[in-house]
């Protein structure tokens, strides 16, 4: 089977770990060079982009935002901040209208400080927090800054204390923490009931496929690989027009921009990455222009010599 470089967008089902999905793709495609773009907890479903081949080198250049649909259960606190965890407290939730509840959600919009759940992949003294948790070790996690781009109250079941939210957030945001902390600001408790990621790193649920469906496709599963260049549409582009420039690029040397690229680069932010392609629109890698915007520095070079 021909192995392509690019991304397969998995619609992860409950019970699978992100690593399970990576291992299955490795097995199906017969390649070890496979990696995911960010862990989804086993109980969380939805969009999990998986990079294949040289695409693994471009993960850091993908859009970092993620969007979820989640249900929060008020009145219950658990050790893991989700409904699967051991219950440690129960407390009545307040009677609120949709508008009143939405005002409380304002505390979680924009840039906020958030303490991750103890069952998380955050490092504590060189070890993952979840490993310490399952060894019953005592430890504390420090607040971290995260950004909530959008937080929409979609439904509010006042009788059962369940609200549904849509949330777009930065990498590193824990929705379980929002569930827990919302319970706190309501003078109640809270935990995450269900969570589905509908988009991540510029990829969307509508383009995803379940692992079980990929397995059924067997040798045809490579047709679902999205070429890396399409995943970088959000990045500005420069075209290397001649072989001399390409030779300089492939050997990692500084390239003096020609007149056409000088005009283009004048509009670029020199601190941001640039997608480099050739005349055939083939991806060559990622570069940065200098502060004077007249030279190109190779940063990530495909087919380096």
Swiss-Prot record:
Gene Ontology terms describing biological process: mRNA pseudouridine synthesis; tRNA pseudouridine synthesis
Keywords (A to Z) from UniProt: Isomerase, tRNA processing
PANTHER family named in the record: PSEUDOURIDYLATE SYNTHASE TRUB1 (PTHR13767:SF2), TRNA-PSEUDOURIDINE SYNTHASE (PTHR13767)
Role: Responsible for synthesis of pseudouridine from uracil-55 in the psi GC loop of transfer RNAs.
CDD domains per record: PseudoU_synth_EcTruB
Name this polypeptide is given: tRNA pseudouridine synthase B
Family: Belongs to the pseudouridine synthase TruB family. Type 1 subfamily.
Organism encoding this protein: Prochlorococcus marinus (strain MIT 9515)
Gene: truB
Keyword Cytoplasm: no
GO MF term set: RNA binding; tRNA pseudouridine(55) synthase activity
Catalysed reaction equations from the record: uridine(55) in tRNA = pseudouridine(55) in tRNA
The EC number(s) this enzyme carries: 5.4.99.25
Cited InterPro entries: PsdUridine_synth_cat_dom_sf (IPR020103), PsdUridine_synth_N (IPR002501), tRNA_psdUridine_synth_TruB (IPR014780)
SUPFAM superfamilies: Pseudouridine synthase
Active site: 41
